Swiss-Prot record:
Glutathionylated; glutathionylation increases affinity to calcium about 10-fold. It comes from Homo sapiens (Human). Dimer of either two alpha chains, or two beta chains, or one alpha and one beta chain. Also forms heterodimers with S100P. Interacts with AGER. Interacts with CAPZA1. Interacts with FKBP4. Interacts with RYR1 and RYR2. Interacts with CACYBP in a calcium-dependent manner. Interacts with PPP5C (via TPR repeats); the interaction is calcium-dependent and modulates PPP5C activity. Interacts with ATP2A2 and PLN in a Ca(2+)-dependent manner. Interacts with mitochondrial F1-ATPase subunits ATP5F1A and ATP5F1B; these interactions increase F1-ATPase activity. This is Protein S100-A1. Keywords: Calcium, Cytoplasm, Glutathionylation, Metal-binding, Mitochondrion, Repeat, S-nitrosylation, Sarcoplasmic reticulum. Ca(2+) 2 binds at D63, N65, D67, E69, E74. InterPro entries: EF-hand-dom_pair, EF_Hand_1_Ca_BS, EF_hand_dom, S100-A1, S100/CaBP7/8-like_CS, S100_Ca-bd_sub. GO terms for molecular function: ATPase binding; calcium ion binding; calcium-dependent protein binding; identical protein binding; protein homodimerization activity; S100 protein binding. Highly prevalent in heart. Also found in lesser quantities in skeletal muscle and brain. GO terms for cellular component: cytoplasm; cytosol; extracellular region; Golgi apparatus; M band; mitochondrion; nucleoplasm; nucleus. The keyword Metal-binding applies. GO terms for biological process: intracellular signal transduction; negative regulation of transcription by RNA polymerase II; positive regulation of sprouting angiogenesis; regulation of heart contraction; substantia nigra development; vasodilation.
């Protein structure tokens, strides 16, 4: 069994690949796949967004190369940004 951090890294990888490749490239998330991932894995994040275009905005911000898909590196940027925001929130409110 690995450390907590190794387990967390494995989970990030597994979550990405559980949702990627259903439509085309197995190493990227389409907009539909990204929406499914967000709804399944980050439903609290989506629920907090009152914007019906939240997924479109997230996709636009993440898709750095403009190919209309989110690769693993772009996905990790989302996870890192949300982790920083959560860390800041919890430290400020503790």
């Amino acid at each position: 069994m690995g450390s907590e951090l190794e387990t967390a890294m494995e989970t990030l990888i597994n979550v990405f690949h559980a949702h990627s490749g259903k439509e085309g490239d197995k190493y990227k998330l389409s907009k539909k796949e990204l929406k499914e991932l967000l709804q399944t894995e980050l439903s609290g994040f989506l629920d907090a967004q009152k914007d019906v275009d939240a997924v479109d905005k997230v996709m636009k911000e993440l898709d750095e190369n403009g190919d209309g898909e989110v690769d693993f590196q772009e996905y990790v940027v989302l996870v890192a940004a949300l982790t920083v925001a959560c860390n800041n929130f919890f430290w400020e409110n503790s």
